[in-house]
Amino acid sequence: MRTRMMALFALIAFCVMPIEAKKVKGNWDIITKEISVRDYSAIKVGSTAMGYSDSWFSLFSRGGNPSYVFGYTQGESASLRITIDENLYPYINVQVKNEELSISTENGTQLSPTRFKIEGTSKKLEKIQMSGCMDFVLRSALSGDDLEIIATRGSDVKMEKPVNVSNCIIEATSGSDIIINDLTTRIIRGRASGGSDLKLTGKAENGEYSASGGSDIKAYDLILNQLECSASGGSDIYTHVTDYIKASASGGSDVHYKGSARSDTSTSGGSDIIKEGN
């Protein structure tokens, strides 16, 4: 019985141990390849896209290198161009399935590129999911119906071109930032957690914000008609609402709002909700 129990514990320990991926370092011989792809409306890049737990490792090792970037342009047809070290290119796996473009590495190989840049084009873009090693930059104006943006594990999403969509969902977690400088939407839902930031400019009819775990939502320059928001765990929300705001703050958090909105507020745990000047 004792032998069987020891064998069982050994098996469990083996199953939960992290698996080391093969590691390949770039050779500084940078090449650019054009890749033929079907049209896509979603982008997913990062260690989670490769089927490995983020807690073990990133398959692209950032090291001391600059951020790796996915640059996107809305256009008439789908295209993809990858710039990377020549010896690493054979390990890159590009797939479009159910209109989702995913970029991973063959057999979970961990790559350490000298340079890694992706430029993509498609007719529409409805979902962006960046994790760990990759940042996303919008190169052109973007329009459509629905847009969902997810940034995790230190990835950044930067949209400095106009974005015009009906519904927008934004989520930044684990030290990630999302910046949208010119957003026009009917409904916006924004969530920041784990030391992440949202920085938003533009206008929306209705919104929901949630900030937790030392995160900030900086949106004085995104004007809403109505907003429901909550801040907790040392987080701050800055917003501008014209008609109605329902806000709660707890655990040393603050909500600052501008505008002439009617308010329904609640605070606890050394938190404040402050109406600022218009």
What are the language-model segments listed below?
Residues 2-278:
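Intrinsically disordered, low-complexity terminal regions
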